[in-house]
Every structure is written in structure tokens, then in C-alpha cells.
UniProtKB/Swiss-Prot annotation:
The lineage of its organism: Eukaryota, Metazoa, Chordata, Craniata, Vertebrata. One of its GO terms (biological process) is regulation of transcription by RNA polymerase II. Involved in specifying the paraxial, but not dorsal, mesoderm. May regulate the expression of T-box transcription factors required for mesoderm formation and differentiation. Pfam families: HLH. GO terms for molecular function: chromatin binding; DNA-binding transcription activator activity, RNA polymerase II-specific; DNA-binding transcription factor activity, RNA polymerase II-specific; protein dimerization activity; RNA polymerase II cis-regulatory region sequence-specific DNA binding; sequence-specific double-stranded DNA binding. Keywords: Developmental protein, Differentiation, DNA-binding, Nucleus, Transcription, Transcription regulation. Its main location: nucleus. One of its GO terms (cellular component) is chromatin. Residues 34-59 are annotated as: Disordered. Residues 40-59 have a biased composition (Low complexity). The keyword Nucleus applies. Disulfide bonds: none annotated. The keyword Nucleus applies. This is Mesogenin-1.
Amino acid sequence: MDNLRETFLSLEDGLGSSDSPGLLSSWDWKDRAGPFELNQASPSQSLSPAPSLESYSSSPCPAVAGLPCEHGGASSGGSEGCSVGGASGLVEVDYNMLAFQPTHLQGGGGPKAQKGTKVRMSVQRRRKASEREKLRMRTLADALHTLRNYLPPVYSQRGQPLTKIQTLKYTIKYIGELTDLLNRGREPRAQSA
């Protein structure tokens, strides 16, 4: 914990230099008084700036997190672009890389792009399914309209169109009556022969 505190204290000293005005103007955590103010007297308070560096990486070196570190320092410890300073093990970090907007962290090839593709695909599937359903309902409506035209006027309701259910019920009833008529017509012929 003491090493972490020393790391943040040295980072704060490094921010006072003139080479990081973009960082201070965009984050403005050093001049702000509040719960995130760095205070050596109170170790229980947070030692990180308001937008925490931990939100970008759990490693103090941005190269380990896959972020560019372009300060041109000597490379050591397997992390390219970062140099370890002295025996204290502190890592030198280029703070200009923090001046970009956090939206750049959501790279184009990340999971968000795949999720967006899935969303677009499901939208396309829904549209196609909706078009198929519309076509099916249109075909069904045309068939019911044709069926209504074949029903005798006895089954219609004085100028009001029949509902789908009424059309089907009356059609079944009408087919039953026609079947009875045909069966009655065949019986006398069978008896006479």
C-alpha cells in the first residue's frame, strides 16, 4: 500500500510540469477541492484522480493495458514504452495519452461492434418476419373475402361484413347443408334403380 501511495504522490509531482496542460484542462482534478483531493494526512481517502486510472487499466503502465505510451523512455521489464525509475520501482507514464476521450477505448473491433452487428441482424430478422406475417395475413384476408363471396346472402348480416370467425362458422354450416342436399338427392335415385 505504501508503494502505491508513493506512486501516486510521484505522479502528482509529475503532473505539475508544463508538458501536461491538456490533461489538467480536460480532467481538472488537481484544482478541484472535494472528496477526491489528494491529502497526505488522510490515508483512508482515495489517492486516485476523479476519473480513476483503474478504469483504464489495473496496470500502472498503459502499454500493459494495450494503450500507447509514447514518451520515448527506455524500455524495461517487458513493457514497451515505459521505463521503471530507480530502486523504488516507480513507472514513468506519458500522461498525454490520457488526454483522448474515453470513447476511443471502445475500439472498432471490440465486443460492442459484434453486439451492434447482432442487433442489426436481429432487427433485419424481425423485419423479414414482420413482412412474412403481413403477407400471410393478407393472403388469409383475401381467402376469407373470396369465401364470403361464395356464401349465399342468407348468411350475411344486412350489409355488415362477416367477421373471420363468422365466415368460417357459416362456411362449415353451408357445406354441411350442401352435403345433406347431395345425400338426399342420391337416395331417391338409388331406390329407383
